[in-house]
Amino acid sequence: MPAPRARVVLLAGPSGSGKSYVARRSGLPILSLDDFYKDTGDPTLPRLDGAVDWDSPAAWDAAAAVRVICELSADGTADVPVYDISRDRHVGHRTVSVLSGTVFIAEGIFAAEIVAGCSTRGVLADALCLRRWPVVTFVRRLLRDLREGRKPPAVLIRRGLRLWRTERAVVRRQCALGARPGSRRQVERRLRELAAAGQESRSA
């Protein structure tokens, strides 16, 4: 198997922990794993209390995410779906490109689910889990979701309280799947190290 042109950093963490913010600050190319949610109406979607459980990994297409990551790693470019969370469906596609010899970030709440798949295929640079105090995550998530109009306010509050109660278990699961836990500063430092290593590789 030829060496990949680029490798992926999987950035996991609870919803609202700041993954997208940290990824943007890194300056590295970003693949949003939220774009691999399944469309509403998919018969395989999991349900909780009579509604779709969007916080279950079964609501997400892990195979498609790994396929696109491998394509980006091998070819430097990939056609990526665009998902509208407020409408629970895909609304288009976009092209993502990365430079040869670099790393790129794939971030999302289910990133840890594909650590093994990416590692087996030789495209994994690192897997990190961003963790914060649950109360901070709760406030960040609620303000973001209300601002973006992702769901009706009552739904967001109920979901937020449920995720608050389960956040520590979510982090434990992500770490058990192979993601290394760290604070925002620790994760940002590791991303800088990986970015610098990529620059050295390109200039060598």
Give residue spans per PLM region.
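The conserved Walker
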Residues: 15
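NTP-dependent small-molecule kinase module
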Residues: 2-3, 99-100, 162-204
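Conserved nucleotide-sensing/catalytic segment adjacent to the nucleotide-binding pocket
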Residues: 29-33, 37-91
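Conserved lysine of the Walker
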Residues: 19
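Hydrophobic anchor at the beta1->P-loop junction of P-loop NTPases
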Residues: 11
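ATP-dependent NMP and nucleoside kinases share a basic, alpha-helical "lid"
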Residues: 92-150
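Hydrophobic positions on the alpha1 helix immediately C-terminal to the Walker A/P-loop
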Residues: 22
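Pre-Walker A (Motif I) flank of P-loop NTPase domains
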Residues: 4-8
